[in-house]
């Protein structure tokens, strides 16, 4: 027979808001319909003035610590999603947890809830956190993940394309993703634990994005990785720890797609370009391209065909090089441009069929930033 609790009755007092926040963060990794019913559980452990909450789905784990008044230590496993719903609506400042006869009682003000305990002995152990690799401030990391994740593929049959490759080279981290039609690369500086740091990982993009969204942006992000056991990546931030299983596979060789010299350059107000693309693409059929005609310091955006609805808009630009016409998937354009944080976008072009590079630029007459590079393959179009 499985044991429902490791220890005797648990008695805890905890701040309701802190508890609700911790439960919500921890249970976000619990699947709505887990393959193994035990993975629907939230593990709660009380000891030494701390309440530890954890959840796991074999791909990603979450572990959270909050302060609590622990009268009696204990460990329980309860339905995580139900606990999250309950804690969202707790009416009083403090909440009391106690266990008796395989029941967890939650009391807050005049509200009382009881939950059946799940067999804690059946719950899998969380992965062991790898050794510390380095750290970076949270806003920098979050922005880099948001930019790099633009080009992750949704094709589950090619797992490597759903991932973000993270390359750690001394004080520089480079994140790259591609779905074969576009490529996103973000680069940032960080503080490595050791001066001679060299590691490459491939982590599922959607998981990395979910982890990054949960960070406290006032605290640093510690990244954990062990070359001897290169199957797991860990993240620590503000008392919260997440791990993610890595993708087993070889990321495509994409470095050759970036070229040093482009013959055609154009600098455009980023938000004005996004707004114009949204307007012009209203007449475009599904998956139809939007044309970008660069001519005489002007950019003409057009969509539609002669026998269909049409739209056109002209923007003033700063251009250097020969006239050129390229066409793109408007959604891919908007997603790439939206990831740029600078007010101007610098487009670099070679021909109408070769990938176009997009970079952010702080000033219209300044230099482009290489912290984020977005490559987009043009679509073929009819004149």
Predicted features along the sequence, with ranges:
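Structural preference for solvent-exposed beta-strand-turn elements
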Residues: 1-383
């Amino acid at each position: 027979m499985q044991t429902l609790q490791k220890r005797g009755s648990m008695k805890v007092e905890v701040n309701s808001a802190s508890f609700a926040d911790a439960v919500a963060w921890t249970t976000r990794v619990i699947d709505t319909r887990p393959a193994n019913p035990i993975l629907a559980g939230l593990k709660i452990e009380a000891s030494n003035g701390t309440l530890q909450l954890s959840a796991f789905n074999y791909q990603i784990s979450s572990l959270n610590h909050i302060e609590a008044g622990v009268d009696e230590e204990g460990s329980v496993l309860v339905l995580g999603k139900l606990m999250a719903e309950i804690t969202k609506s707790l009416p009083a400042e403090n909440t009391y947890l106690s266990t008796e006869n395989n029941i967890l009682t939650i009391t807050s003000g005049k509200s009382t809830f009881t939950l059946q305990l799940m067999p804690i002995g059946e719950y899998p152990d969380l992965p062991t956190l790898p050794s510390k690799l380095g750290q970076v401030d949270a806003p920098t990391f979050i922005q880099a993940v948001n930019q790099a994740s633009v080009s992750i593929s949704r094709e589950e049959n090619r797992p490597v394309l759903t991932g973000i490759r993270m390359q750690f080279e001394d004080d520089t981290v480079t994140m790259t993703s591609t779905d074969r039609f576009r490529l996103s690369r973000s680069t940032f500086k960080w503080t490595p634990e050791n001066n001679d740091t060299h590691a490459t990982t491939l982590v599922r993009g959607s998981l990395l994005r979910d982890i990054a969204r949960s960070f406290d942006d006032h605290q640093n992000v510690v990244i954990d990785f062990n070359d001897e056991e290169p199957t797991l990546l860990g993240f620590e931030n503000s008392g919260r720890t997440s791990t993610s299983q890595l993708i087993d596979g070889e990321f495509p060789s994409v470095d050759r797609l970036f070229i040093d010299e482009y013959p055609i350059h154009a600098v455009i107000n980023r938000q004005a370009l996004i707004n114009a693309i949204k307007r012009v693409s209203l007449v475009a059929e599904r998956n139809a391209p939007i044309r970008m005609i660069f001519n005489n310091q002007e950019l003409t955006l057009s969509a539609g065909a002669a026998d269909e609805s049409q739209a056109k808009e002209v923007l003033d630009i700063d251009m250097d090089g020969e006239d050129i016409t390229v066409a793109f998937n408007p959604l891919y354009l908007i997603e790439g441009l939206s990831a740029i944080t600078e007010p101007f976008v610098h487009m670099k072009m070679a021909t109408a069929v070769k990938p176009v590079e997009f970079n952010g630029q702080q000033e219209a007459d300044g230099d482009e930033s290489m912290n984020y590079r977005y490559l987009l393959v043009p679509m073929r179009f009819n004149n």
